[in-house]
Design a protein with these regions (language model features):
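ATP-binding N-terminal substructure of ATP-dependent carboxylate-amine bond-forming enzymes
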Residues: 1-96, 126, 306-307, 315, ...
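Flexible, glycine/charged-enriched surface loops at secondary-structure junctions
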Residues: 252-258, 308-313
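ATP-dependent carboxylate/phosphate-activation module, predominantly the ATP-grasp catalytic core
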Residues: 162, 184-250, 254, 261, ...
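Short acidic/polar active-site loop segments enriched in Thr and Asp
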Residues: 66, 178, 246
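Peripheral (often C-terminal) accessory segments that flank ATP-dependent C-N-forming ligase machineries
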Residues: 129, 297-375
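Active-site nucleotide/adenylate-binding loops and adjacent lid/helix of ATP-dependent enzymes
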Residues: 102-181, 187, 199-200, 227-231, ...
């Protein structure tokens, strides 16, 4: 029986754990004990911080694992790459994973490779001199965010200089390394792109249309596949994504790229994660819309058993999230069992909250059908 190490044990990793068990693999999981919902589902669980890469490596060497992976976790990706590199397993280089994890290093790589992205600065304080430098070199409005976090945490749109200092201070407080990204705001529609890579070859899977709260925090409210973009735009975005992945050195596993497309059709890469998209995009929506089991693909890459994806379906899929901003969805949640196409739903809170990050949401509803489900 092959042994698969899984980094992380939150609800985000549950589809990975369940798929590994379905495939008959022996699972060894590492995560903080708090919130480790997968610890009772795996064969072995170690309450080790997912960023303690050397301690995790030690256990993986003792267990002689055959592969290591994670899904939908930016924080876990560098540890996965480090262990794989040290043990001669399939994965991205540790350097590539670190570059993809830090938004500033990522943007520098994009610039060097000619990948279109917004103008940006990385700052480590909100002193007057820093504010002055930003004002002199960039145009409002701006987006301020931590350089090393995800899930819309600490992200804010800044419309005027008076609130810039507070926005940077908040982003620095959210950042693990106390770095904040300041970038010129790009208007237009927001999409994301899912790829899987193996030994340096990249395979496009799907493009997702997004609906967000908009300013100031841009938290996702809906995801829908496939995108309504033209075939020509699909081809352009796939080509840009391949160049961006190569610039980061991402050669193996899933990737999730986020884009903005202006009204004039200009395309900008906002960021790329060396992991599949969260919010059920990678774990559910890709499979429902294309027929390709993305989670299994990630495991196959880690074990060196990857087979080129075959897209067998052309369905629509999507997810609606419940929060104060989308309380109009409450009757649909109450009647979800009778709505054609709904495949899974859950309401986690009775009292809905206004959201500033994805963790504030109170439920989800996933659908599949021949056409987009409009609620």
């Amino acid at each position: 029986m092959k042994k698969l190490a899984i980094i992380g044990a939150s609800y985000l990793q549950r589809p990975l754990v369940e798929k590994a068990k379905e495939m008959g693999l022996y699972t060894i999981c590492f995560a903080w004990a708090e919130g480790a919902v997968c610890k009772d589902l795996v064969d072995e669980f170690y309450p080790i911080s997912i960023v303690d890469k050397d301690e995790i490596l030690k256990v993986c060497q003792e267990k002689q694992i055959d592969g290591i992976c994670t899904i939908a976790s930016d924080v876990a990706a560098p540890t996965v790459a480090y262990v794989a590199e040290k043990m001669g397993l399939i994965g991205n280089s540790h350097q590539a994973s670190v570059t993809a994890y830090n938004k500033y290093a990522m943007r520098q790589a994009f610039m060097d490779a000619g990948v279109p992205c917004p103008k940006f600065l990385c700052v480590e304080d909100c002193a007057d001199a820093t504010i002055h430098k930003i004002i002199q070199s960039m145009r409002l409005p701006l987006i301020v965010k931590p350089a090393d976090r995800s899930g819309s945490l600490g992200v804010v749109k800044v419309e005027n200089v008076e609130v810039l200092k507070d926005a940077i201070d908040n982003a620095l407080a959210c950042s693990f390394k106390k770095q904040a990204m300041v970038e010129e705001f790009v208007g237009g529609r927001e999409i994301s792109v899912e790829f899987i890579s193996y030994q340096g070859k990249h395979y496009p899977l799907q493009i997702t249309d997004k609906v967000t709260t908009g300013a100031p925090h841009f938290v996702e409210l809906e995801h829908h596949q496939p995108s309504i973009l033209s075939a020509e735009m699909y081809a352009e975005i796939y080509a840009i994504t391949e160049n961006a992945l190569n610039s980061l050195g991402i050669t193996n596993g899933a990737s999730h790229s986020e884009y903005k497309i202006t009204e004039d059709g200009d395309v900008y890469v906002i960021e790329i994660g060396g992991r599949m998209g969260g919010d059920f995009i990678g774990s559910d929506l890709v499979r429902l819309s294309t027929g390709y089991d993305f989670v299994k693909g990630v495991i196959d890459v880690a074990l060196g058993e990857f087979v080129e994806p075959q897209i067998t379906n052309t369905n629509c899929s999507g997810v609606y999230f419940l929060c104060k901003e989308t309380e109009y969805l409450l009757p649909y949640f109450a009647n979800a069992n009778n709505i054609e196409g709904v495949v899974m739903y859950e309401q986690t809170d009775v009292e809905l909250r206004n959201i500033s990050c994805s963790a504030d949401r109170s439920g989800y509803m996933i659908y599949k059908g021949e056409k987009k489900l409009i609620l």
